Amino acid sequence: MRLFSLAAAVLLAAVVSAPTASAAELREVTGFGSNPGALRMFEYVPDGLPEGRPVVVAMHGCTQDAAGYGTGAGWVELAERAQFTLVLPQQEQLNNANRCFNWFQAGDTARGSGEAESIAQMVQHALGETGGDPARVYATGLSAGGAMTAVMLAAYPDVFAGGGIVAGVPFGCATSVVDAFTCMNPGKDRTPEQWGEAVRGASSHQGPWPTLSVWHGTTDSTVAPANQRELVEQWTDVHGIPATPTSTDTIAGYPHEVYADSSGRTLVETVAITGMGHGQPIDPGSGEEQCGQAGAYLLDVDVCAAWHLSESWGL
């Protein structure tokens, strides 16, 4: 495990925490549940937040902390601007030496078990505390956090309305340390049905299923861009729609593919960030569509993934 954890510090790298005024308003929440995964919960609740607002869960990658990712990716400022509750799970070194979420361990990815259950308990606590809307709960994350996002959407599809995976891998790709490296690069090529069966087998849920937005850099050598396509195949199969885009356009000049149902509702989408390596797309600034703070694996590519995710979710 130590070998994997040390390697993961590079392979599923994290954002360096940077203190800001917004991050200082984050607070740790204890006693949110039985916490079988022994995670820490941090939360940002805007002052005067009315009841009935959404909840977003944002998950970091290896070696980073909740505040660093929440601030760097832009989620803290968006929570304030759009008025939603932000939940930031944080891994502990006792679980993983480099604080990677254990997205490749069966005991931490099965419904009702380990880290996945801890995150689900955080959601329920946040909903109860703020009077949030249980129909508008979303999950997102970078790299290892993106892989854990796939876990949460698959294991708790009744909890999450949608998700955003940045530089992640499909659910069920790995069940061991060795598998984890293969999943990241070069990735695993399975049929859409095989990928879909992994999700359908993760719970007794029969639908509706969470929507999914997948962001990935085209020159990512840490988590192969092929994983973006495999995620599309997995979730279009789950939704019962073809893995062929119904429309294509661009977002901030980057290729954007939409996979919609017969009514035109977007169920799966991808954004391929041309020329970007491994990291979270951000666009620092004060403009309406801008957010984030540049740093390690927080890449200023003139588009903020967090803002576009929040817009697609109607936050």
Task: State each model region's role.
Residues 3-6, 19-55, 67-74, 81-85, ...:
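A domain-start/cap signature at the N-terminus of enzymes
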Residues 107-130, 151:
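Alpha/beta-hydrolase active-site loop
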